[in-house]
């Protein structure tokens, strides 16, 4: 046997929740049981189990254990009553409370409970990118995303509130911007299942280590209905004055793609997955999410190439649902070989590729913050290009690859969209083909090449520096 070896435990230790090598065949069942328990309990996360060749080759049988008792691993399941009472007191005293919801609420599957809490407290809800969908995006109390590409109203709400009640949020730099100026008028309650996440980035007034759903249920149990009509009206006024908007450019309008997906999949139980880049932010801004429409993305990890393979996993895990992958032309090429997996597994995925011939998000930052010094972001660039390329366009060298031909090479089908008028009919046709033939499809949309994702707050800046 050809022997290959790498310290996979060392390589993955910093990116997995837990890693272990099984050295004894007799311990295999116990370790597998522990791995699944650790992965699913507390803050969910990946667990790697390394199986040496001799352990896999050794014959034998072992009964699968029914219980797990891991020394030193006791995920918190309760809610500290004293801290909870302090948090509720702040809610009752606040004139301008708001909820900041992160991905922890979605992981806890507490969307219904979160909606009830927002309605009972009568407070506006803003979300991180990972928290979007924790309350329906069409709910009147939902304001939008906070942070670098969040809405004006959501960021203004955080800037003006007197109580920020955060659940399942890490307060990363894309959310806070300049920490000294973040939520300057607010007391902060932070509920998170991971104690290390509390006060790590933002110092909070009331820390509560608890599962999101358990904490929300306790708050619902111990609070009376409240009203904040003037505050809600003020927040709604900001949203009306500074709504998200679309620019009309050549090619396909990127925001229109997302709104077309909302229309086409309105009556479908759908999982959307997103790659990383401008398209991810447009998806986070414009997708309508609720109990039957979910968005899966890699959040702060920022992994280009995430869209297609995560869609494969979503479709295998949820065969009864429609699954749509949203990618850019750069990110899609990082894992496009997974089309072969989707074809072989007969998965009816619809892959939407935003093709602007750019690594768009990096190019946007080069344009806005680096005096348009464009470097390695034009995907039409050829070695033979002359001089410094400042404004690549449709007359540049031929784009590589041809996504339609690539789909055909994988035994699938591709579609090419060059105008907004083609969007709805093409996506409907692609979905019908995918479902009828049990094959993935690619819908390549030629996006306006210089469209920017707005609003935007520069990294390390604050709300007062927002660009609309």
Regions flagged by a language model, labelled:
Residues 55-78, 175, 405, 420-424, ...:
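Glycine/aspartate-rich loop-and-adjacent alpha/beta segment that forms the canonical ThDP
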Residues 13-19, 69-70, 236-250, 387-390:
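Short glycine/proline- and acidic residue-enriched helix-loop micro-motifs
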Residues 364-397:
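Acidic, Ser/Thr-rich peripheral helices and adjacent loops at domain boundaries
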Residues 153-172, 281-361:
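Thiamine diphosphate
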Residues 3, 74-86, 146-150, 252-253, ...:
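A general structural motif
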Residues 236-314:
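Active-site diphosphate/adenylate-binding microenvironment
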Residues 3-226, 260, 264, 348-351, ...:
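N-terminal alpha/beta PP-like core and its mobile active-site loop of ThDP/TPP-dependent enzymes
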Residues 51-57, 103-105, 195, 276-280, ...:
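Glycine-rich beta-alpha junction loops
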């Amino acid at each position: 046997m050809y022997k290959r070896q790498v310290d996979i435990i060392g390589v993955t230790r910093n990116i997995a929740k837990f890693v272990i090598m099984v050295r004894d065949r007799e311990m295999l069942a116990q370790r597998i049981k522990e791995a699944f328990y650790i992965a699913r309990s507390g803050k969910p996360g990946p667990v790697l189990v390394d199986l040496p060749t001799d352990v896999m080759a050794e014959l034998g049988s072992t009964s699968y254990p029914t219980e797990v008792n891991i020394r030193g691993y006791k995920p918190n399941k309760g809610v500290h009553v004293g801290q909870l009472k302090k948090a509720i007191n702040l809610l009752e005293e606040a004139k301008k409370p708001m909820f900041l919801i992160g991905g922890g609420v979605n992981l806890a599957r507490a969307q219904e409970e979160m909606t009830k809490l927002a309605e009972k407290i009568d407070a506006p809800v803003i979300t991180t990118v990972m928290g979007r969908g924790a309350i329906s995006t069409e709910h009147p109390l939902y304001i939008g995303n906070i942070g670098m590409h969040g809405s004006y109203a959501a960021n203004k709400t955080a800037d003006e509130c007197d109580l920020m009640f955060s659940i399942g949020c890490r307060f990363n730099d894309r959310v806070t911007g300049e920490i000294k100026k973040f939520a300057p008028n607010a007391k902060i309650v932070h509920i998170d299942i991971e104690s290390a996440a509390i006060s790590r980035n933002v110092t909070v007034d009331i820390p509560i280590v608890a599962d999101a759903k358990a904490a929300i249920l306790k708050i619902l149990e111990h609070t009376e209905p409240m009203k904040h009509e003037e505050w809600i009206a003020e927040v709604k006024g900001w949203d009306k004055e500074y709504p998200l908007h679309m620019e009309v450019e050549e090619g396909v309008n990127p925001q229109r793609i997302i709104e077309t997906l909302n229309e086409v999949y309105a009556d479908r139980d759908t999982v959307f997955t997103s790659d990383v880049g401008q398209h991810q932010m447009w998806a986070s801004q414009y997708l309508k999410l609720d109990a039957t429409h979910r968005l899966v993305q890699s959040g702060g990890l920022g992994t280009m190439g995430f869209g297609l393979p995560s869609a494969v996993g979503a479709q295998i895990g949820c065969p009864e649902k429609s699954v749509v992958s949203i990618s850019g032309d750069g990110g899609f090429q990082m894992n496009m070989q997974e089309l072969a997996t989707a074809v072989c597994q007969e998965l009816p995925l619809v892959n939407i590729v935003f093709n602007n011939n750019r690594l768009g998000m990096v190019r946007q930052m080069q344009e806005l913050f680096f005096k348009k010094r464009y470097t390695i972001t034009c995907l039409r660039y050829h070695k033979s290009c002359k001089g410094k390329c400042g404004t690549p366009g449709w007359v540049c060298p031929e784009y590589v690859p041809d996504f339609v031909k690539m789909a055909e090479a994988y035994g699938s089908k591709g579609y090419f969209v060059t105008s907004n008028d083609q969007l709805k009919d093409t996506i409907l046709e692609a979905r019908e083909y995918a479902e009828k033939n049990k094959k993935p499809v690619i819908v390549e949309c030629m996006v306006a090449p210089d469209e920017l994702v707005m609003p935007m707050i520069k990294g390390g800046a604050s709300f007062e520096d927002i660009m609309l």
